Amino acid sequence: RKHEKDFFARKETKYNESFHETAKKVHAHINELNKSLISEDLDGSQAKVLSDLVVQYNTTFQKLVALQLEIGLDAKSGLYGSLRNAVHGIEKLAKEADEYEILFHMLMLRRNEKDFMLRRDPKYMEKFNNNISNFENALATIQPEKLSQMQSSLNKYQADFKLLFAKESELGLD
């Protein structure tokens, strides 16, 4: 349990490896216990049940680790990194075109994203969707040569945020 908590608190894969090693040791101890019970002509069925629970716990934890890896361990990995790259693309294009209204709307979306990441509250998805509409309305005033790039980056950002929301929901929101 300690390695599990450390993995989610520190977001470092070494704790997943430690968890796996500890689970193997526990499983080996359970097998030894089962052999001892059998050698003493005692019922080893509870050791089998315990072994199955350890396997189930390990499997569930590995699924959660895979989910967290997909979400991201830091600002540059997983969906966190993808969101960051997409929004930086929009920011760069908006600055180059002196489109400060676009920057404003981008920052509002970023605010919704960060509020969701910090508070893990589904209400920020609704706020995000409202601000996407505002952003798209502001895009109507953009020069056509910049519009397709911004729209493409916005679509990527929106898709990644929706996927992040889904994955965080699967992981468990507060």
Where are these regions (language model features)?
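Membrane-proximal N-terminal soluble sensing/regulatory segments of transmembrane proteins
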Residues: 1-59, 63-174
